[in-house]
């Protein structure tokens, strides 16, 4: 039996242990959307995936569809992402807001651009990143993106309130 291998760039949002040596990773991909993938044996020392697929990393990842979960078959680290609070909070919000496996290339591009940027990770960076996430998910209007910082934060809070989180 042959399996189709899906390869895409992905931002690893989180991981959780499963069994003795396995982990389930939550990865936002350009082509597949939000994917929960099982990496078998990744916690063992000789694992080929170890180090290439860690939370807060941008990686080229390959999956095959399993019965319960996607299975992670390979990963190649592109860049580590800062775990500074101004970066970690928007990525955690992203994981909460995206439901299911629906592709959203515009959202992925906006998040990838923020992740790869050299801007300092401060309150303004965080507010801009959250506003882009909420805009691409339909919680903010285009006109909200040009507001000053105080009004932008009010618009973000209204968007979050609309999401019922």
Question: Residues of each region from the PLM?
Answer:
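Non-catalytic alpha-helical scaffolds and adjoining flexible linkers that form interface surfaces
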Residues: 1-23, 28-58, 62-165
């Amino acid at each position: 039996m042959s399996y189709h291998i899906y390869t895409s760039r992905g931002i690893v949002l989180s991981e959780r242990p499963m069994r003795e040596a396995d982990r389930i990773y939550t990865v936002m991909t350009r082509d597949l959307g939000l994917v929960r993938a099982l990496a078998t044996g990744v916690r063992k020392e000789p694992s080929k995936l170890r180090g290439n697929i860690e939370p807060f990393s941008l990686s080229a990842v390959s999956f095959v569809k399993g019965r319960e979960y996607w299975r992670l078959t390979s990963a190649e680290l592109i860049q580590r992402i800062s775990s500074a609070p101004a970066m970690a909070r928007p990525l955690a919000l992203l994981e909460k807001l995206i439901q299911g496996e629906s592709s959203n290339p515009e959202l992925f591009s906006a998040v990838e651009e923020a992740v790869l940027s050299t801007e300092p990770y401060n309150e303004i960076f965080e507010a801009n990143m959250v506003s882009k996430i909420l805009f691409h998910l339909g919680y903010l209007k285009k006109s909200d993106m040009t507001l000053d910082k105080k009004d932008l934060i009010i618009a973000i809070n209204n968007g979050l309130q609309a999401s019922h989180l």
